[in-house]
């Protein structure tokens, strides 16, 4: 049964959803600006039910971040630190493997690992980290390295992003997180994260990752200087 929307403009969105048509910029802006929050929620659930029925899942993971040292110095970031900062940390392989094992049980399904753009850690160092984790926890899914990290690894190793991803996958990488996407708007990125990959570079790296059989997601950082138009463009 279809609802009686408080905002009748949502009927056009429902028609597109049921026809499995892709929404456009105007549709996205309407969904942001309509006062009919319950109507938007109903539409979202309509899509969820069509795609997944009543299935859902819970993931038990551990975050194991190897370092917070980062050369990027993004204005939005409260995580990254300079090497000379007394509070900065960089774990050894042994410390990483030990931390992953703390509180480990068969219920743990994933290790989630991201870090700063460290000026001294090499691609081989990260590959050895992955191999050590796979040897110790062969059943655990390794989700690691944002597209931004991959771009930095490639730059430092003087390799293509594809070659970097191949090496990491061979070492045990199973998938990637979606961090570093922020907002794809060039205008916004120049202000909040000008040292990171631009939007096109981020997406190109993700496409390369997917072409190699790796899966990833994509985050969106909002609530700062971006516009509603920037958000919709990011989602599309």
Positions of PLM-derived features:
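Conserved Radical SAM active-site core
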Residues: 83-234
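N-terminal pre-triad scaffold of radical SAM enzymes
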Residues: 39-84, 88-114, 176
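Short, intrinsically disordered, charge-balanced linker/junction segments flanking boundaries
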Residues: 16, 233-236
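Flexible, acidic/Gly-rich N-terminal and inter-domain linker regions that tether
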Residues: 1-63, 67-71
